[in-house]
UniProtKB/Swiss-Prot annotation:
Keywords: Decarboxylase, Lyase, Pyrimidine biosynthesis
GO MF: orotidine-5'-phosphate decarboxylase activity
Active-site residues, Swiss-Prot/TrEMBL: K62 (proton donor)
Residues at which substrate binds: 11, 33, 60-69, 120, 181, 190, 210-211
GO biological processes: 'de novo' pyrimidine nucleobase biosynthetic process; 'de novo' UMP biosynthetic process
Protein known as: Orotidine 5'-phosphate decarboxylase
EC number: 4.1.1.23
Length: 234
């Protein structure tokens, strides 16, 4: 297990509130994730504010477009200096290969590039409604194999898929898992959830955790408790 597996998901419509929360966290204990809402509201300046506080950033914009457009988008993310960014595996092999190729000039400074498989909010019935008549797990496996074929660094997946994906795709293929809730926490709108220790045991490399930390009375204490549950020193 890496020593900084926790990625705190920021979901704020108030920049000052977000920065106040960030200032209560420790960059040695977690990374941060910014998604579509916050990036649309606050743009690249928010990324700079986060970097100035020494946090690694996962820019979670889930690019999905024609290959050339997605290649340019991930290049823009690399120029911002983010630690990780993502694209939709359903964009296809050519799109994913173009995105990966666009990051080659950045060498070791390139962000990790991962693909979204099946959103953790989607059930088998939800998939059927959009014409995918296989169980979520089977569809995740198919998309994950395609992602690895394209040369990407890993996928976003439910912790329930992690064990088989890790065993079939290898230790170096990173698994980023949302839908993580500490024991006793509300599941919210996530259908397929696990606790942090369960997810790590299953093979997840990075755990995306939002409200259990960001809405806690003491966010740093909540983060520390999760660290302790994972037996992470520090």
């Amino acid at each position: 297990m890496n020593n900084k597996p926790i990625v705190v998901a920021l979901d704020f419509d108030d920049k000052n509130a977000a920065l106040q929360l960030i200032d209560r966290l420790d960059p040695q204990m977690c990374r941060l994730k910014v998604g579509k809402e916050m990036f649309t509201l606050f743009g690249p300046e928010l990324v700079k504010d986060i970097h100035s506080r020494d946090f690694d950033l996962f820019l979670d914009l889930k690019f999905h477009d024609i290959p050339n457009t997605v290649a340019k988008a991930v290049t823009a993310a690399a120029e911002l200096g983010v630690w990780m960014t993502n694209i939709h595996a359903t964009g296809g092999l050519a799109m994913m290969e173009a995105a990966k190729k666009a990051l080659v000039p950045y060498g070791k400074d390139a962000p990790l590039l991962i693909a979204v498989t099946v959103l953790t909010s989607m059930s088998d019935e939800d998939l059927k409604l959009i014409g995918i008549d296989v169980p979520a797990f089977e569809h995740v496996q198919r998309l994950a194999r395609l992602t690895q074929q394209a040369g990407l660094d890993g996928v976003v997946c439910s912790a329930h898929e992690a064990q088989l994906l890790k065993s079939s795709l290898g230790e170096s293929f990173k698994l980023v898992t949302p839908g993580i809730r500490p024991a006793g926490a509300d599941k919210g709108d996530q259908h397929r959830v696990m606790t942090p220790p369960q997810a790590i045991e299953a093979g997840s490399d990075y755990l995306v955790i939002g409200r259990p930390i960001t809405k806690a009375a003491d966010p740093l204490a909540a983060l520390t408790a999760i660290h302790q549950s994972l037996s992470i020193p520090g």
